[in-house]
Amino acid sequence: MSSRNAPSGCVAPSPATAAPPSPTNLRLTVGQSGSESANEPGGEPEERILQDGFWEYGRFYGNWKKGKYNFPIDKEETSRLDILHKYFIVETEDRVTSVPLDKEGSPKIMDLGTGTGIWAFHVVEGYIPNAQIMAVDLNQIQPALIPRGVTTKQFDLEEPSWEPLLRDCDLIHLRLLYGSIRDDLWADTYRKIFEHLAPGGYVEHLEIDWTPQWDGEDHPTHSAIREWSQQFHRAMHRYRRSVKVSSEDTKRMMEAAGFTEFKETKIRCYLNPWSTDRHQREAARWFNLALGLGLEAMSLMPMIDMLHMKQEDVVDLCKRVKAETCVLRYHAYFTLHTWTAKKPASPPQ
């Protein structure tokens, strides 16, 4: 079915790409003694390593370092994170990183905020098979079986010391960590990244600017997408874990940490598959799917706890956003920013 005649305006990804990336096949059903299942009572067991947590607003949240990560870690969310990774891979035409790495060698890599670990798995399974990767996250939501070459580490990146983490890395990769790091700790985070890189190593940081833009003049006067974005930004600002994107601030902090060769690229993340371009349309299908599945996860705790919105009002806002993203004449997009910088091969003279 083409995007032009889809009744709702939203189209599922094509059958050729609908299967999730191969790392998801590594999951197996496990349980940990004394830990709650991350499924509703009576449901199927979770196919991930499980950690203690709590139910709130109908979703399951992590207990470790409670209050630092205000989004769910349940099966719905981990599946959504894998789908979002698929979007990145489709959008970049199967490029897992934009920095030069030795594909025939054994580069050392850290993936900070790894989530389900799918980016790290993709690197060793299809890009650099001999890479050594430490996949770091606050939550243990990675599969119980992981590819050779990858180790997972539960760690709080806001800790003063990163002594337990991998050193002399060729690449340190971050993706969508805004909202998880306190605003006043980003400069120190870049400094620690610099310290854990080998001379000549790279940092690569990807973030989505959740402020909507539109191609052309056709967009709703009272846009649910714009309303959601404003509320989401307000809530995260009150946590002091802002999701506001500032390339100037990022460049300044990276250079203050010692990085050189700062580069930025921007990609438009279209919210629906309106385009006649096949690649752009396919990428938009995946982004539409990931966004639709993730709106409540991103919104419930921040908007209820920080803005004192009622749960039913948050759910209604998310429904209105999903409906608006399925109107093909509205060419809305968010912006994906990728920042890279290099640790000099030798100290400045």
Swiss-Prot record:
Q: Which CDD domains match?
A: AdoMet_MTases
The answer on whether this UniProt entry bears the keyword Glycosyltransferase reads: no
Keywords in alphabetical order = Methyltransferase, Nucleus, S-adenosyl-L-methionine, Sporulation, Transcription, Transcription regulation, Transferase, Virulence
Going by the record, the broad EC class of this enzyme is: transferase
Which Gene Ontology BP annotations are present?
methylation; sporulation resulting in formation of a cellular spore
Q: Which GO terms describe its molecular function?
A: methyltransferase activity
Its Enzyme Commission number(s) read: 2.1.1.-
Listed GO cellular component terms? nucleus
A Pfam family of this chain? Methyltransf_23
Cystine pairs = none
> What biological function has been recorded for the protein in this entry?
Methyltransferase that performs automethylation. No other methyl-accepting substrate has been identified yet. Component of the velvet transcription factor complex that acts as a global regulator for secondary metabolite gene expression. Controls the expression of the gamma-pentyl-pyrone gene clusters. Required for the expression of cellulase. Regulates asexual sporulation (conidiation) by environmental stimuli such as light and/or mechanical injury. Required for oxidative stress tolerance. Also plays a role in defense and parasitism on other fungi.
The subunit field of the Swiss-Prot or TrEMBL record says: Component of the heterotrimeric velvet complex composed of LAE1, VEL1 and VEL2; VEL1 acting as a bridging protein between LAE1 and VEL2.
Question: Which protein family is named in the record?
Answer: Belongs to the methyltransferase superfamily. LaeA methyltransferase family.
| Name this polypeptide is given | Secondary metabolism regulator LAE1
Gene source species: Hypocrea atroviridis (strain ATCC 20476 / IMI 206040)
